[in-house]
Amino acid sequence: MNDKFGKKRPDVAEANTLALKAGWNYGETAELFERNYQVQPAHLTPGTYTNVMGNQALAWGLVTAANLSNKELFYGSYPITPASPVLEELSNFKNYGVKTFQAEDEIAAICSAIGAAFGGSMALTGSSGPGIALKGEAMGLAMILELPMLILKVQRGGPST
C-alpha cells in the first residue's frame, strides 16, 4: 500500500492498510464455516514424478484409446474455459493420427464431430456449461442417428458462465 499510495496520498495508504488488516482479521476469526480443512504436504519417496493436469491426462487417455481401437481421433471444439486445454493438448499428437478442429462456434464444433463419426473416426467434442447448452439440438441429431461420439463436459469451479 505504501509503495502504491504512500508518497502521494499517505491517508489513502493508511486507510487501505487498515481495511486490509480488518478484512484479514475478520476472515481469520469469523466462524462462517462448520469445518476447516487443511491439506498437509505430501510425503513422497525420492524418485521421478510427472506433474499432470486433469485435462492433459484426459487427452493422453483419448489418444491411447483411439490408438488401441485402431481409429483416428477427431476432436472438434470451440475454445471455452476450462475445456480449452484438451484441444491444446490433443493438437500436439498429429503424429498419432489425431485431427483437431477449432470451430467458429459450439454448433459447428459438434457438427464437425458428427461428420467425423459418419466417416468412421473416434469422434469427440467438448465444452463447458453454456457451450453444452448450445450443442443440444445437434446432440439430438447424433442420438437419433445412433452415432458413436463422445461429448466432454468440463465443469467450471463455480456457478459462473
Predicted regions and their residues:
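Accessory "access/gating" subregions that flank catalytic or transport cores
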Residues: 29, 37-102, 112-115
